[in-house]
Amino acid sequence: MKFSENWLRSHVPIQASREELAATLTAIGLEVEAVTPLGDALGQVVVARIIAAVRHPEADRLQVCSVDAGQGELLQIVCGAPNARAGLVAPLALVGAQIGELTIKAAKLRGVASNGMLCSAKELGLDSDASGLFELPDDAPVGQALAEYLGLPDASIEIKLTPNRADCFSVRGIAFDVAAACASEVAAFDAAAVAPVSTRTLAVELNAGSEAPRYCGRVIEGIDPAATTPVWMAERLRRSGVRPVSLLVDITQYVMLELGQPMHAFDLDTLHGPVGVRRSRAGEQLALLDGREVTLDDSFLTITDADRPVALAGLMGGLDTRVTNTTRNVFLESAYFDPAAIMGRGRKLGLHTDAGHRFERGVDPALAPQAIEVATRLVLELAGGMPGPVVDAALPHHLPQPASILLRRARIARVLGIQIDDADVARILTALGMHVEAAADGWQVTAPSRRFDIAIEEDLIEELARIHGYDRVPTTLPGGASRIAMPSETQLDELSVRRQLVARELQETINYAFVDAALLERWQLTDGVVPLANPLSAELAVMRPRLLPGLVATLGRNVARQVGRVRLFELGKVFSAAGPGDAPVESQQVAAAVCGDALALQWGEPARKVDFHDLKGDLLALAAASGAVLEFQPSTQPFGHPGRSADIYRDGVCIGWIGQVHPRLAKSLDIDVDVIAFELQLAPLVKRALPRAGELSRYPSMRRDLAFLVPDAVSWAALSASVRTSVGPLLREVQLFDRYVGQGVEPGFKSLAMGLILQDNSRTLTDRDVDAVVADVVAVIEREHRARIRG
């Protein structure tokens, strides 16, 4: 929100300096982003009129002007502005004036004397327009100091508003906050009804229910089409970042900036029949003020006449019904539209308007009739005309009602930790425009209709803290015993997990917790998905149920940008629900995804691509840090490559997945390389058993190697489990050191060779002991897995 300092001071008379005012605004939550002084150094700049302008004898683009500066004799000025012409009134910097870094001196330009400089608005620091001389009204008093004529010095102040403070999208809304902070009062404002002179009206039909519950309209006939915007209004608009256009348009903009009510002016003679508000119909077309013709769907609110849409409600007027410099009869609109009915509609069409921005945030539902009276008075004062009666069509049961809240003294003290005097509480709330009545244990407070962000007791307490001053809240240290949680040896913390993965050359990624529903459909992960009620965009419409879809998408973006070796991991929350309407459950997961070369390019190792076993090694290193013993079983997850993926188990419970992403899925994601990934629930992974010191055996270990022919369906995990169960405590380790299929092995079978390492803590094992163990192992494997010893 940008506004003129002098305009604000006209609504709230305060003695604070410009710097103090800016500091106060920031302190009460209206953060000042920029203060631009205007006209502080225009002491020798006056209003002047060009009497004659002739071409410079030595330069085609220069003119020699005779200028009346109110000094009795004409001054000769050489000027290069394209709009310099006889009769033009413009600012003149006299000899000796300081314009920015330039001191004006008498000089000769191409041999012709020049005694001053005719100025553009940019040269004077009043505007960004440098296309020509700053054109002043024809009736501007020649010889008067420009600063005096324009009401300078002034400043343009720009503040940053939080979404809840839509009431401060107006000078008067800001004035209430400043008055409360400076112990002042907001000046009285004349919004009295203007008596109608004619009986001309347009009927108003409300056909959008709660989306458009109020619409005020007024006909004004016989205005002067030659009337122009007065300099005081044009300057206030310009200093608020709005370029003056024409009187009727400028009046609607002026009322919006002053009161916060967007308005629109229609050329009455272009409207056919009653005015209505309704939802658009799919396929309807409308030519907008910016010259574009748009095709609407059924989500827009439209203003209509008897047979067509004539404006997009709350966004932009139509081209066919706009006011022009020939308009004599006008229909003024001032309405309240529900924010939800306007929100997002402008973005659909690539529109961003000041009116739309205000309606999206919320406009005072009681302001429409006042605004139309203020606008009427301005039209009559500046352009004449005969006003008809105001038509105020409303659906009262759909209009928001101000909240009435009990504010308790004890609650103020508990929330803020300080006591605020009763008199200060009443003064602050009253200055903010609230109706305050004393109650037994506090106050009954009714918020003004413009403050729809005030809904509960804590909202009022926030207002008190904001205006009373956060800097007046004493700094106190928290009391009570400090309970600092000590790291537990039975838990591997998240930082350690991150460090372990970083040590394995993985880089951490942080993705949105929201994903595209279409992406989850590709992964076939749509069960238990939690949709968002108000997503940031269609691509971020659901909460992620797993980390892998987002992580692999990030890997794909890196691959698309010619990153050959990608190694990423993420640790974050995932969300799922048992069914529609059930509360979502969140949990922590850790996931990794890799592709490209297994090792960074070097001269000492041959290049090879990363595979399942490389990432499995990274996973086992992570598991070793927590002492977890993981088991792997073939997986049937639809997003995994058949035969190259496994479910991960700990203590018999499935806690994750590892494998190659299915090639079809990778191709649909525009990834043309093999992607290896894993994903784990964090909680079962990080459980860590307390380390126990074991006795080192003084006796030697013995090894026996065995090779079995086993059916293809038998996994090494099943085989090794049988060995461990059979041997018992004598088994130190069982290792798979060879797998063979081919000549000498019948189809449907494979040869697995294992090494058994045996050791006893109390004695040296004999060959007889070892042979007995081997015999038991052979018998168990042959019995349980239909295997046979390979000769």
From Swiss-Prot:
Cofactor binding summary note: Binds 2 magnesium ions per tetramer.
Catalysis performed (reactions): tRNA(Phe) + L-phenylalanine + ATP = L-phenylalanyl-tRNA(Phe) + AMP + diphosphate + H(+)
Signal peptide range: none
Domain FDX-ACB: from-to ranges: 697-790
Cofactor requirements of the protein: Mg(2+)
Protein location: Cytoplasm
One GO MF term: phenylalanine-tRNA ligase activity
Keywords: Aminoacyl-tRNA synthetase, ATP-binding, Cytoplasm, Ligase, Magnesium, Metal-binding, Nucleotide-binding, Protein biosynthesis, RNA-binding, tRNA-binding
One record GO biological process: phenylalanyl-tRNA aminoacylation
Residues annotated as domain B5: 400-475
Family: Belongs to the phenylalanyl-tRNA synthetase beta subunit family. Type 1 subfamily.
PANTHER family reported in the protein's UniProt record: PHENYLALANINE--TRNA LIGASE BETA SUBUNIT, PHENYLALANYL-TRNA SYNTHETASE BETA CHAIN AND LEUCINE-RICH REPEAT-CONTAINING PROTEIN 47
Name the UniProt record assigns to this protein: Phenylalanine--tRNA ligase beta subunit
Recorded name of the encoding gene: pheT
